[in-house]
């Protein structure tokens, strides 16, 4: 993490300084023109291992009808419309108790047939990962077969728990999950949400997360120029950016103010658990 620079008084603007930076809003619009990165032309999945001879084991959802959970759909629609922290918390709670469908698509291989004809060998299957314009990797997941078919009618649904889907996404070096990509309620599930699902723990907004608040308090402790501090949500809903407001003693130079914020940011950067719970970090400095 790096700190934002600020002079004395209230900083003119926040500067995000999270371990993943600012990840964008909860809408999946940035992935609308995605490109697939889930497999290569040789029929390998994104881990580089052939799917030949592999079987999908029983998931515990053999009687699943593929219908989306109405409560989950409503929660996703609320976040897509107004991504407040409360709405996001409701969505993650609904998602944790539901199931998702992960798409499996044909990983075609170009083969040359007799007489020089070219055809696609689509015997291999793979789970796609997508790459957004900003370079983020994402695993698409869906609430039901209707949303999946809207995205890709040829994709096969594999039901699984959100925890298992999140663990698979992390194993594939994905940064986010995309919920119901292609729908009007599509939502990007940010890294903090991805890790919460994978670890099967409740997700909390960073500025309300006890672990994060304790970590910030420890990072600020021992800074004699800091009179008090608070943690609050950033200015842009749906980004997951947390703002740390530092109230410093009067009379500090610009360089001294920046040094304080830098030291605090560097301490926070060493806390791996905090990094998994905070999507972005900004500082605002005031004087007492």
Residues covered by each model-derived region:
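An interfacial alpha-helical scaffold signature
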Residues: 1-288
